Structure formats: C-alpha cells, structure tokens
Amino acid sequence: MLQSFDPATGDLVWEGETAGPEAVTGALQNARKAFPAWAALPVAARVEAVQRFKAALEARKEALGETISRETGKPRWEGLAEVGSMIGKVGISITAQAERAGEKRSDMPFGQAVLRHRPHGVMAVLGPFNFPGHLPNGHIVPALLAGNTVVFKPSEMTPATGAAMAECWAEAGLPEGVFQILQGGRETGEALLSGDIDGLLFTGSAKAGAHFRHMFADRPDVILALELGGNNPLVAWDGDVEEAASVVVQSAFVTTGQRCSCARRLIVPDNEFGTA
C-alpha cells in the first residue's frame, strides 16, 4: 500500500496499491502493443490529443494546483503556477515538434545527407517530488507528440499528483496503452527500468542520474534523456545590499529549498556589513 501525506498537517492525501512486477510487465507489454498504431498516426492527430490534454489541465487547474500544494508543502500559489507551466509546455512542445521533426535534406559534395526523425518506442518517465507535475510533463508531452508510448512512475511522495495527471490524459482520449501510470517506490522504478523499454526520460538528482548511467551502460539501444539538478552559488558583489538580501532569502527558501535553482552558498565581498 502506498500513501502520501500533507507535510503541513499530516493529513492523508492519497493511498492506493503499489505496482508489482506483474503490473509493470503488463504495462510495458501494453505500451509495446500500442506503439505501432500510435507512431503511424499523422502528427496532426497526436497534436489534437495533446491539445485535449491541455484543455483537461485548464479545466482542473484549481484542483490540480491544490493537490500539488498538499503533497509537496508548497504554497497554493506555487501549485497553481506549476499547473500554468504544464499548460504552457504543451504549446512549446507542439512548436518544437514542428520545427525539429520530419525530414531534412542537405547538399553534400558527393550527394545529399538526409536526416529523418522517427518515433523511438516505449519511454519510461520517472517523476521527481519537487515539481511532480511540471517536470515529468516536460518529458511526457514531447514523447507522445513524437509518436512514442509512455509508462510513467511518479515519485512515491506525490502519487496523487501523478494520478490527477493520468486522469487528464484519460480525458484526452488516448488509445489504450499509449500512456500508463505505475504507482510505487524504488522497487517499482527498478522493475520498470529493467523491463522492455527503449528510453528513460528523467529530471532529478545527479546521484540518481549516475545510477541510471551505470544501469544502462551495456544497453546502447536505450536512449537516456537525463536533466540532472545541482545548486550554484549566488554571487552578490555590489549594488543594493538590502535588495540582494531579499533575493537571497527567496532563492534559498522558496519551495522550502527544494529547487535546483535554490542557492545553497552565498559569495559576498568583505564590506561595512562584515565578513563572509
């Protein structure tokens, strides 16, 4: 049994079954079966499906923002802002797909070079807990637009957000097996990545990314799209010190510090305010 709790109150937010090995295998088989037909659809049809997902997000924005807030401990305004980013990502992805996909030919000294983009297969997407909607959404939407099928495992800390996203995809009317969700912790994730996948799409910690690189070192057929977080220092060298102090505090503590953009180190010169 998997449960998530509101970190501010301790109240139960979500509970449900953890996906075991059989469920993982079944989801991957369904994704593999659905792939040829989904990949063969015209891009315009996939765009329409993603637009329906966007409409579902817009209709559920308040509820989804509240769910994100309750599971992560973010202020409600941050949860709503995250849903806004998810909605915006759809348009960005559609534009990027139109610019980058298809076939491109270039003249060469002894002929032509041809670049063709094609769907790759079954993509596994792992979601982090700090932006449980926006970050996995940034992988799922482009993957589906490109004609891949997706099996998504949210963070075990934010299953309710993942479930709400899955409801939006269901409302979009995707064919069976094109998008599936598996709830669970590390064991579920390891089972997913050990299965029949063609790619792993992940945004999260550098430590997790290093583990995945080692895990797939002997699988050159599996593409790895890893966006790995780290924290850079914030340098406040001159200017309005009072204003800089306000920005520093926001940078360190927004989203309770759980952002890759949160500064954990501050570099300042020695001045009338003292030494650092």
Specify the residue positions occupied by each region the protein language model found.
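Short beta-strand segments
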Residues: L126, Q180, T203, A225-G229
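N-terminal Rossmann-like NAD(P)+-binding subdomain of aldehyde/semialdehyde dehydrogenases
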Residues: M1-G111
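Periplasmic-binding protein-like
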Residues: V141, G199-T203
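Short gly/ser/thr-rich secondary-structure transition/capping motifs
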Residues: G102-F110, I181-G184, V247-V248
